[in-house]
Amino acid sequence: MKVLVTGATSGLGRNAVEYLRNKGISVRATGRNEAMGKLLSKMGAEFIPADLTELVSSQAKVMLAGIDTLWHCSSFTSPWGTQQAFDLANVRATRRLGEWSVAWGVRNFVHISSPSLYFDYHHHRDIQEDFRPHRFANEFARSKAASEEVINLLAQANPHTRFTILRPQSLFGPHDKVFIPRMVQMMRHYGSVLLPRGGNALVDMTYYENAVHAMWLASQPQCDHLPSARAWNISNGEPRTLRSIVQKLIDELGIKCRIRSVPYPMLDIIARSMEHFGNKSAKEPAFTHYGVSKLNFDFTLDISRAQQELGYQPIVTLDEGVTRTAAWLKDHGKLHD
């Protein structure tokens, strides 16, 4: 087995490389951060620096040579960006990579999507894979849904490659650059965390290692009989109030900080104002309408399909995941400017 991991220099992809190397699996990794690429090489991975939005066929040929399984973790995940940027990174890059994978004989293509395509500014619990909102919440969600359509079309036309879609909810852990780092920044700079409804939203999260474990299961021969392009929700399977998760992080980090309850409408007005000025400056604001709303609404997934069909069970609990993440942040100096 030889696995190509895209988006390997941060987040899920970075954790995926470590997971595979710990199993002794041959790994080829690609990403844009060449400094991190050197660290991946020291772990025993073969690193090829590349920007998938600019990849040409000659580069793809080298990247995919000898690969039988591809874990496509690369994605533009910001809540702030243009339609063109999301389409280029999440739709076009996925289509071209999928086409090249088929051409060069990749047997398994695991595509990392997002439950954001379910989000519609309403409370939802135990969301199943076939749920769709009346309209997508933002360009990111729309682009991830479009990337899944690309995967579906590729699967229909190419039966010799099995495509898998995984939708992990609220990923966190070592090498995270999104949710936890932003929370920590707020804790450090303001000494408080502002949460709508006091953090009473019931949410699901996914520790990176659990998501990678699901990717591993989906790549095994026992899953070959499953329909190509089938989608599975992935989470820790431990819905908690957002407040309890944030408080656990505060306690583990030992930061002097308190959680402040702010009315959702007030926080949303602030976020919309920041978005207005952000549009003028082209800079991502500290708060966005989408980001604030994700903190306000109940949002949990039904993972029974993954449990029954992939044999998925989380291997790291939510509490242990937060403890490990806090330890990693402290060990790597992420609590200082």
Swiss-Prot record:
Gene3D superfamilies: NAD(P)-binding Rossmann-like Domain. It catalyses: 17beta-estradiol + NAD(+) = estrone + NADH + H(+); 17beta-estradiol + NADP(+) = estrone + NADPH + H(+); testosterone + NAD(+) = androst-4-ene-3,17-dione + NADH + H(+); testosterone + NADP(+) = androst-4-ene-3,17-dione + NADPH + H(+). InterPro entries: Epimerase_deHydtase, Lipid_A_modif_metabolic_enz, NAD(P)-bd_dom_sf. One of its GO terms (molecular function) is oxidoreductase activity. Keywords: Lipid metabolism, NAD, NADP, Oxidoreductase. Belongs to the 3-beta-HSD family. This is 3-beta-hydroxysteroid dehydrogenase. It comes from Klebsiella aerogenes (Enterobacter aerogenes).
